[in-house]
C-alpha cells in the first residue's frame, strides 16, 4: 500500500480548507495517473480506468463503492463498457481536500 493510501481520512466540515497550490503540486506527484481539472468551478481529481469488458468494469465499480461507503466519502463514477471514470472532490468545500488524494490513492490500490 502506498504511503498516501495508508493515511487516514479526517471528518470534513464545510469550513475545512481546500488544498493550497503547493499542497496540490506535492500531492499530485503521489498520484501521477490522476488529472486535476475544474468542473463547474470546482477543482476535482479524475482518472479513467480501462478494463477488458463490462463485467470487469462493474466489479471495479462495486469495489470502489465499498471503499467509498467505508470512508463515507463518495466519488462520481461513470461505468461503461471497458472503462470506469472516477472523479474525487469534496462537495462540502467545493474543491479538493487532502481526503480526495487519499481516496484517489486507495482507488489505485484496488487494481493491485
Curated annotation (Swiss-Prot):
TM region positions: none
Alphabetized UniProt keyword annotations: Lyase
One GO BP: tetrahydrobiopterin biosynthetic process
One MF term in the entry's GO annotations: 4-alpha-hydroxytetrahydrobiopterin dehydratase activity
Pfam families: Pterin_4a
Catalytic activity of the protein: (4aS,6R)-4a-hydroxy-L-erythro-5,6,7,8-tetrahydrobiopterin = (6R)-L-erythro-6,7-dihydrobiopterin + H2O
Protein EC: 4.2.1.96
Database matches in SUPFAM superfamilies: PCD-like
Protein name stated in the entry: Putative pterin-4-alpha-carbinolamine dehydratase
Amino acid at each position: 500500500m502506498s504511503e498516501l493510501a495508508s493515511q487516514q481520512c479526517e471528518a470534513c466540515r464545510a469550513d475545512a480548507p481546500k488544498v493550497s497550490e503547493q499542497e496540490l503540486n506535492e500531492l499530485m506527484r503521489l498520484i501521477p495517473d490522476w488529472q486535476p481539472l475544474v468542473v463547474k468551478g470546482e477543482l476535482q481529481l479524475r482518472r479513467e480506468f480501462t478494463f477488458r469488458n463490462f463485467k470487469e468494469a462493474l466489479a471495479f465499480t462495486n469495489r470502489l463503492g465499498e471503499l467509498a461507503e467505508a470512508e463515507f466519502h463518495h466519488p462520481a463514477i461513470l461505468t461503461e463498457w471497458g472503462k470506469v471514470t472516477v472523479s474525487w472532490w469534496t462537495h462540502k468545500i467545493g474543491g479538493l481536500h487532502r481526503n480526495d488524494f487519499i481516496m484517489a490513492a486507495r482507488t489505485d490500490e484496488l487494481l493491485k
